[in-house]
Amino acid sequence: MVGPRLRDARQRAGLTLRATADALGVSVGTWSAVENGRTRITADRVAAAASLFGADVEILVTPDAAPPQAAGTWRDFPPLDLPPPLAGALSAFVELGYHGATIRDVAQRAQLSVPGLYHHWPTKQHLLVALLDRTMDELLTRAEAARAEGDGPVERFTLLVECLVLFHTHRRELGFIGASEMRGLEEPARSRIAALRVGLQRMVDAEVREAGRRGLFTTPLPHEAARAVVTMCTALPTWWSPAGPTPPATVAAQYVEFALDVVRARRPQAG
């Protein structure tokens, strides 16, 4: 399918879903549907996307040019590849905070001059919006893939928890600013990105609610329990460190058990 190849090309180009949609003159929802294979794309728009991404249009449209996304790839985390300005901004915002970091701090980390940075990124706000767009774009793509692998609400719930934990450990810096710097966003970006976060929460809400309806989760407070589970996962960047003794996969397995306890999952009886 052309959609996953377009997504891969966009991510290699360091472009967010929002920036791509704006450049191609479509809505974010439409471009997301294209990348996920839920809607068709015209040849002209494929060509425009290829030009935007600096990709070969023939590779994008040839069925055998790239393998389809394999099951489980949402668990794979290659090194984060950001353009230098965004990598510099991420480093500065994590270390100094959005309000504490200056454009000069970002430029130094990006190994650019201040005028050179301003040429492409006129304000810190543009950098923050791009980083949070990238964060939510990757997280939602992974969460949708994880959820799609599940057979029934309990498995979908546990896969979503695993996905959240893996993202907030492997992508700890993105997760950190996602939790700490929402207050720095200005409108309309703040409302738009907040809506994406709500959409992620609703994925978990839906599985907890359905498992409760089937008698598989017994919490009397499914709404609150689902929010507690997501908050527990998104808080990981505040304490987990790659230098610590527990690798991401182990943390994920532990948190799945914690989450099942929170929702009071029915466990098989011993013996």
Label every model-predicted segment.
Residues 84, 130, 145-173:
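Hydrophobic alpha-helical connector segments
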Residues 170-205:
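Short secondary-structure transition hinges
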Residues 4-12, 76-105, 109:
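Short, amphipathic alpha-helix enriched in basic
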Residues 24-30, 36, 92, 96-126, ...:
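Helix-turn-helix
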Residues 39, 43-46, 65, 82-87, ...:
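An amphipathic alpha-helix adjacent to DNA-recognition modules
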Residues 23, 148-150, 186, 198-225:
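Hydrophobic alpha-helical bundle segments that form small-molecule/ligand-binding pockets
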Residues 42-59:
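DNA major-groove recognition helix of helix-turn-helix/homeodomain DNA-binding modules
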Residues 175-179, 190, 194, 212-258, ...:
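Hydrophobic/aromatic-rich alpha-helical bundle segments in the mid-to-C-terminal region
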